[in-house]
Curated annotation (Swiss-Prot):
Cofactor details (free text): Binds 1 zinc ion per subunit.
Binding residue positions for Zn(2+): H74, E78, Q188, H196
Family listed: Belongs to the SIS family. GmhA subfamily.
Annotated GO biological process: carbohydrate metabolic process; D-glycero-D-manno-heptose 7-phosphate biosynthetic process
E.C. code: 5.3.1.28
Subcellular location(s) per record: Cytoplasm
Residues annotated for substrate binding in this entry: N65, G66, G67, E78, N109, D110, S135, T136, S137, S140, Q188
Listed name of the protein: Phosphoheptose isomerase
Catalyzed reactions per annotation: 2 D-sedoheptulose 7-phosphate = D-glycero-alpha-D-manno-heptose 7-phosphate + D-glycero-beta-D-manno-heptose 7-phosphate
Keyword field: Carbohydrate metabolism, Cytoplasm, Isomerase, Metal-binding, Zinc
Misc. comment: The reaction produces a racemic mixture of D-glycero-alpha-D-manno-heptose 7-phosphate and D-glycero-beta-D-manno-heptose 7-phosphate.
Gene Ontology terms: cellular component: cytoplasm
Lineage of the species this protein comes from: Bacteria, Pseudomonadati, Chlorobiota, Chlorobiia, Chlorobiales
Domain of life (superkingdom): Bacteria
Length: 211
């Protein structure tokens, strides 16, 4: 049985809950606005890199842990299957490296978890491809190792980070750091929005919808 906090749920409590809703959603919106105003040029540059890679016959690999793994899978699916139903286009080659549980568990067991994504980059990545790493802290060693390996393979690298960028700051060719620390949730909300904007821009740059 799940027990509540034991507090009453009168009008005052409901008002406080509503304040939580407002505070949370308004802060999230303000953080996104700040990120957009400070990083619009970086987002456009990332989109150009992705669009150019697709034009050259390359692909995008994505990796992250936990909620960032879910974001990687979310964005890879929208590239390969569809982003908006109003845009008709062919599939765009993108692979989230967190989807194969057999590969993840074998890699964790045989190589150590920190080596898992780098091993998958070795398997799927080719010179000229892109690796997009997501980390709300910037300190995910498995993503750091994957970015390092990708660069050694001649791949281009992108990073969506949070806080102060952590250990991943400066590792990627292009990076965007969401300036929020202490919790992953607000950073993840920005990351998925940035991902959606990237896909929108890529579709426009490739001529599948109008600018």
């Amino acid at each position: 049985m799940i027990k509540g906090c034991g507090c009453s749920d009168g009008l005052t409590d409901r008002t406080r809950y509503e304040e939580v809703v407002l505070d949370t959603m308004l802060y999230s919106a303000q953080l996104k606005e700040r990120v957009a105003r400070q990083n619009s040029a970086v987002i456009v540059a990332m989109a150009r890199m992705i669009a150019g890679t697709f034009e050259d016959g390359g692909k995008v690999l994505l990796c992250g842990n936990g909620g960032s793994a879910a974001d990687a899978q979310h964005l890879a699916t929208e590239l390969t299957i569809r982003y908006r139903s109003s845009v008709e286009r062919p599939a765009l080659p993108a692979i989230a490296l967190s989807t194969d549980t057999s590969a993840l568990t074998a890699g964790a067991n045989d190589l150590g978890y920190d080596a898992v994504f780098a091993r998958l980059v070795e398997a799927y990545g080719r010179e000229g491809d892109i690796l997009l790493g997501l980390s709300t802290s910037g300190n995910s060693q498995s993503v750091i190792n994957a970015l390092d390996f990708a660069r050694q393979q001649g791949m281009k690298t992108l990073a969506l980070l949070g806080g102060n960028g952590g250990l991943m700051k400066g590792l990627a060719d292009l990076e965007l750091i969401v300036p929020h620390s202490g919790s992953a949730d607000r950073v993840q909300e920005c990351h998925i929005t940035i991902g959606h904007v990237l896909i929108d821009l890529v579709e426009r740059m490739l001529g599948y919808c109008r600018l």
